[in-house]
Amino acid sequence: MIRRLQDNGDLIRAFPRVHFVGIGGAGMTGIAEVMLTLGYEVSGSDNADNAATRRLATLGARVMRGHSAANVLGTDCVVVSSAIREDNPELMEARSQRIPIMPRAAMLAELMRFRHGIAVAGTHGKTTTTSLIAAVLSEGGLDPTFVIGGQLLAAGANAKLGAGQWLVVEADESDGSFLRLNPLVAVVTNIDADHLENYGNDFSRIKDAFTEFLQRLPFYGLALLCLDDPEVAELVGKARRHVMTYGIDAAADVRAEDVVQDGARMCFTLCLPEGKVIPVTLALPGRHNVLNALAASAVGWQLGVPPEVIGRALKSFVGIGRRFNDLGDVAIGNGACVRLIDDYGHHPRELEAVFAAARGGWPDKRLVVAFQPHRYSRTRDQFDAFAAVLSSVDALVLSEVYPAGEVPIPGADAKALARAIRARGRSEPVVVGQVASLIDVLPDVLQEGDLLLMMGAGDIGSIAQRIVHDGFVFGEV
């Protein structure tokens, strides 16, 4: 049936049924939740069940396990994750039925069409920065809508439909899809050589993409750029838009001075334009999180949030799931305990920042890391950097690479990485084939008082949660 647009004055309601292929992905669940709240009939499919899909089901979404052509029958639009193959039966059926198919980023752009968009781009720190911006604007009474790649612990979700005019989102550079967005404010945290496989293994193309991202701002838009990152600093002269800088760098427009770490907190002086200076306590560890907080402070200042309200939001921020998530002290037998931290970090630069935060907060503890590399291509491209940063810890357990759909690459697996680390002569890594085997191996590595970091973007986080849930009964798989 051909429907006339004039038959329904509300164009959003004219095509109410939206189906998400790969609905369980971090970038998909938030969009689905916002569309549910807007009143759409949301359905979705995924090969795996997780907490996010279960939450969507409780909110009214129809979530199917596995992919089938029948799942898209009767839908008005199909939203597809970048992880979905072109021969997926649901996509093939949608094409045959001439159902509109939209990439995830394109649907995010559609949501942004009706609000003032704030898009956070960068190789690292997007989720934390986006979350901090949402927290600052919420504390300032602006009630933003947000779509985040991780769970905002205070909200218990990674998305929320607010009544205000601002929409805060992550802008994903990994596949170039951030170039679909047309924000009013663009934040760039840093630029690093990651996801090179999507840019012809050419770092210059990644940098060019960020330049193009800023050109998508309207002439009255604003680019917020981190001056501490040398690649981002180069964008200041290329942006051709209004620019505000932030950083610990003394030349930044919004900057931090007197930065000190106090356990899991960072204390610093926030210096805002017009000479406003306030003391800030950030409830997150690490200098990298100070930079993330400065980005949020700059956005808040631009939108009129009072400085003291910005400071209050930063102090009360309780974090995001799997971003230096302190799971507390856990027993490892014989009355001994270790401190367990779960973190999503999976790039050498992220590992370096997390290790620095851990040592800064707990300098007297032995640093033990259980790491699951993510993607064979990243392990290959960053091989030497991984070996360097992982050789700096006191004890290391490696699981096999989480493939994320990739086929193994010779010389880019956990055993090869362990050999490279061992050759540096600073540590003797332990290698396990399956990530679940960490539960068996860790008791022999850990000592009383250790700080245990479980890190990676694959499924290692579920092992950390399993240990917590089972009361840290090691030795059972």
UniProtKB/Swiss-Prot annotation:
Keyword Cell membrane: no
SUPFAM superfamilies xrefs: MurCD N-terminal domain (SSF51984), MurD-like peptide ligases, catalytic domain (SSF53623), MurD-like peptide ligases, peptide-binding domain (SSF53244)
Keyword Cell wall biogenesis/degradation: yes
Any Pfam family the entry gives: Mur_ligase_M
Record InterPro entries: Mur-like_cat_sf (IPR036565), Mur_ligase_C (IPR004101), Mur_ligase_C_dom_sf (IPR036615), Mur_ligase_cen (IPR013221), Mur_ligase_N (IPR000713), MurCDEF_pg_biosynth (IPR050061), UDP-N-AcMur_Ala_ligase_MurC (IPR005758)
Superkingdom of this protein's organism: Bacteria
First-tier enzyme category under EC: ligase
One Gene Ontology molecular-function label: ATP binding
Intrachain disulfide bonds: none
Catalytic activity: UDP-N-acetyl-alpha-D-muramate + L-alanine + ATP = UDP-N-acetyl-alpha-D-muramoyl-L-alanine + ADP + phosphate + H(+)
UniProt keyword terms in alphabetical order: ATP-binding, Cell cycle, Cell division, Cell shape, Cell wall biogenesis/degradation, Cytoplasm, Ligase, Nucleotide-binding, Peptidoglycan synthesis
Subcellular locations according to the entry: Cytoplasm
Biological-process GO terms, alphabetical: cell division; cell wall organization; peptidoglycan biosynthetic process; regulation of cell shape
Cellular component GO terms held in the UniProt record: cytoplasm
Enzyme Commission code: 6.3.2.8
Annotated residues for binding of ATP: 122-128
Gene3D superfamilies membership: Mur ligase, C-terminal domain (3.90.190.20), Mur-like, catalytic domain (3.40.1190.10), NAD(P)-binding Rossmann-like Domain (3.40.50.720)
Pathway terms, separated by semicolons: Cell wall biogenesis; peptidoglycan biosynthesis
Main location: cytoplasm
Function: Cell wall formation.
Family under the similarity heading: Belongs to the MurCDEF family.
NCBIfam families recorded: murC (TIGR01082)
Listed name of the protein: UDP-N-acetylmuramate--L-alanine ligase
